Regions:
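Conserved HGGG/HGGXW glycine-rich cap/lid loop of the alpha/beta-hydrolase fold
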Residues: 16-71
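Gly/Ala-rich beta-loop-alpha elbow adjacent to hydrolase catalytic centers
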Residues: 103-112
Length: 160
């Protein structure tokens, strides 16, 4: 897929009297698939881009950032499970409609499962994945480095 076909936009959500601005990416045509990145200080919707590019050949794909994460400024808000659940409900109620499927990474899967339990039949399919399994160092450093393997062995070695 030609990455110039990815459209970037902003969405707004209000929580406890604050308007929070977040980013989203959209590509493709067809049934809607929502991509939810992991909730991590280094995770953004950008980590979903390779998957978005593959799916966009058959689906309309939307990837969003979570509030307090991603590329937008982080407002001084306590990000509780209630806040993040409310955000996800806002996404399904106001940002995306008629969702064919959702891919949720890491802890985002927990919020998706909670939403599905509260709204049976609203989501056609769900795929729960953990793309940040490799840990934060390669993501922060822009790729693997030779010393990461030795560092991982040192961290995983039981202490005396």
């Amino acid at each position: 897929m030609d990455t110039t076909m990815i459209k970037t936009g902003d969405l707004r959500w209000s929580w406890q009297g604050q308007t929070i601005e977040l980013g989203f990416d959209e590509a493709g045509h067809g049934p809607l698939v929502l991509l939810l990145p992991a909730l991590s200080s280094i995770s953004t919707r950008g980590e979903m881009r390779p998957l978005m590019e593959r799916l966009a050949a058959r689906f309309r794909v939307v990837a969003i950032d979570w509030p307090g994460f991603g590329t937008a400024p982080r407002p001084a808000v306590t990000w509780t499970p209630d806040a993040l659940s409310s955000f996800l409900a806002h996404v399904f109620g106001n940002v995306v409609r008629d969702v064919h499927g959702v891919v949720a990474a890491g802890h985002a899967a927990t919020y998706l499962l909670h939403y599905i339990a509260q709204h049976p039949g609203m989501i056609g399919r769900a795929a729960l994945i953990a793309p940040t399994w490799r840990g934060p160092l390669p993501t922060m450093a822009g790729g693997q480095r030779p010393f990461f393997q030795a560092l991982r062995r040192a961290v995983e070695t039981p202490g005396i």
